[in-house]
Amino acid sequence: MKMKKFAALAAATVMSVSAIAATSAFGVFATTDAGVNNIVIKDSDTNRVYKAYQIFDQASATNTIKWGQGINGDALLTKLKTSGLNTYMSQFDSAENAVDVAKIISDADHWTKEDTAKLAKAASSCIIDSKSVTAHEANGEYTINVPSAGYYLVVDATENNGVDKANSALILNVSGTTDVTPKRTKPTLTKQIKHNENEAWGDVGDNAIGDDVEFKITTTIPSDVSAYDKYTYTVRDQLSEGFTFNDNLTYKYYDADGQEITSVTVGPNTTVGDDSSTTDYKESFYVTFDIKELVKNYPTVAKIETYYSAKLNEKAKVAVTAPDSVNNNPNTAYLTYSNNPQDKTGKENGETSKITVYDWTFSLVSNKVEGRASCRC
């Protein structure tokens, strides 16, 4: 059966996390084999692993579509009927072969981002690994030489190992040379402390024992999380022993233009105390946001500000003279987030860098001046 129009579906490219950017590039299925067919991925990260799997093959002589050698077609048919594609799920129920699937997704102009991401995710679970073609890297470009024209699932197979990386899966229509530039938007975290004299937010505070010290944690949200069934997003905060947490967390939400989004009803889950799953870090509290639900209800949300205060207690380190590297009462935070939509264990998470702010606390020194007591701090 001839197919002159076939949607080129680019599935969600994940930016640990996250961030994530899902795009759709619609085009025509190649009607002839260009001879030399390759995928060129422009990526400055030279430590990644990219693989390609042929999903649909089109015989150049007859212009007919069949399953590619990199996919288990029967398994994909079953998966498409159960993967919850919002718009086209009922049509897939009657699909029997590659041609049927091609006909359904050739009208993909009205697919949602979630549909597009789920299609790639379904295909990712049905690949034949022994039939993959692995990219070779040179000068910031990964080249995958594929055997013939057709539709390929390109998978970022890089092992994350808990570092700040992200994985992606995308479907491309390949005829000749097809260029790809991965778009990764990962969440970020910054932390600030309010100075007691000028009310400015910064890296260093200057307070006395007994003061309530204010803190602000700012985190960004990936531009698209549609590839994930669930997206982990947890702010982890560690107070030094000189602080007592006041348990007064509040939140503000903003769009990409910095406009505050008010009346947000999708609240986070907060736990005061340590998380046993982070063995190398002792939390004072951690906050988990349901990013999928938040984005569903507030599609423009791009940033979260988390506010709280803590009291400087009698265990605070005191700098007698000038601030030093020891007596500085540190406060550290970082963010853990999902970075692989193909992960079924929920354990493949990325981490932002740990950000630390300090409060230098000075002692009160009493001096006798002509019968009057004075002090300096």
What positions do the PLM features span?
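Bacterial Sec-dependent N-terminal signal peptides
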Residues: M1-A10
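Serine/threonine-rich, low-complexity linker/repeat segments that form flexible spacers/stalks
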Residues: K5, S18-D45, S168-A227, R236, ...
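Bacterial N-terminal signal peptides
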Residues: A12-S18
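Low-complexity, serine/threonine/proline/glycine-rich extracellular segments that form mucin-like
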Residues: S44-G84, T218-Y253
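Serine/threonine-enriched low-complexity regions used as flexible
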Residues: S44-T46, S148-A149, L153-V174, I217, ...
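Ordered hydrophobic segments in well-structured contexts
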Residues: V49-D57, I127, E141-N145, A149-N173, ...
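Extracellular adhesion/glycan-binding regions together with long Ser/Thr-
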Residues: T87-T158, A256-K311
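Surface-exposed loop/edge segments in extracytoplasmic proteins
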Residues: A200-G202, N246, D257-G267, D343-K344
